[in-house]
Amino acid sequence: MKKHILYLLFFLSVMGLNTSCNYLDIVPDETATEADAFANPRAALKYLYSCYGYLPQSNMVQGCMDFTGDETISPFAETYVKFAEGSYDSSNTIISYWNTLFQGIRQCYLLKANISSVPNISKDEIDLYTAEADFLIAYFHLLLIKCYGPTVLVKELPALDTPAANMLGRRPYDECIDWVANLFDDAAQRLPATRSTADYGRATSVAAKSLKARMLLYAASPLFNGNPDYANFKNPDGEQLLSTTYSEEKYKRAADAAWEAIELADAAHYKLYESTSVSTSYPEPNDLTQRSLRMTFIDKEDYGEVIFAETRKAGTYSIQRKSIPYFPRGSWNGIAPTITMIDRFYTANGLPIDEDPEFNINNKLDIVTIPDGTTYAVPGRQTLYMHMNREPRFYAWVAFENGYYECRTTEERYAYSSFWGAKASDDKWIKIGRAHV
């Protein structure tokens, strides 16, 4: 009897497993499919926005290539600091465009392949979305070129079952530049020059031409134009990836592209930012040049200079929050320019600090008393000699010991000294000596 019971229990267990497997094999009805993404015009627009979602978030330190150099330093254990430390390697990827941008390129090609099948979508919408997809494909390739040099050119939607032997390889640098430039030109012909407030941040013809011009200038630079260091940079089949022959024509091409972008932007009423108002609450910056340089990055009311905007909300780890001096409500001063970058700012006479006879470069680290009448720092207090008598860009963009800083939510002017943060007061605001403004 016991033996029969055991057989019965075993049989029921097996049947239960089979039932469970069949149940788990069922795809839930609410699971989104590719067809759902193009079910109607609204869904197609959401899919287009998902293509934009692959853009690196340039206001976050984790996605900004500006932090791969030696221009900044941080006291925190930030991942991007590994570039400056020399501890970046293939097993510790940071800002890895290779892992994400090819996904974005495929997403764009899927949109191009399916957009015409969307019910009730207009021809104008089809043309616009396709142009935006081409713009993003070009821009994603541009970012790959900036990060890796010669890259894989994805010119069409690749099949998922492509055998390894047919996988695309890297193409020569000049071929990459030419293909991306042509794609930017093609997209620009079908994109609007400006965007309404509701569509702010989406691709425009001005953005396409501007990015093309910047890319061509980069390609004309000595880094990629006739650099002999790349003589042995070749594909496995021996194909040269970077030409070692200098071409002056590349500079002319870059200049022509830049002029074309400027004329297009001017016709669309883009303009350089200029601050026309001066604060009456503060002793500085009364200089309009200095105010324009500072406010061009923070004036939300006048953004006529912005060509291609980052519209995603800045979070806790945004560049802005980590750059400005310590505030109790969420700013941490975790990014600062290096001394090398500080030295690159000119003097008040418009000369490099090592070429101005009135600037004693040997005394740049001396502690000095700020004289009466100074408008960019607190008279009577102390700071370093190198902070004195510098150009407007320096005082617009760099906060330093006992220099002034404007706060939007208060009419107090605070100076900075010491190293570690404290409550809102006129001291102890900069953790690492100086900060980006």
Regions found by a protein language model. Name each.
Residues 226-246, 415, 419-422:
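A solvent-exposed, charged loop/short amphipathic helix patch at secondary-structure junctions
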Residues 39-58, 77-148, 162-200, 205, ...:
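Conserved, well-structured interaction surfaces
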Residues 1-29:
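Bacterial Sec-dependent N-terminal signal peptides
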Residues 246-263:
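TPR/TPR-like (Sel1-like) alpha-helical repeat modules
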Residues 80-83, 89-95, 257, 271-436:
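Elongated scaffold/linker segments in the mid-to-C-terminal portions of large proteins
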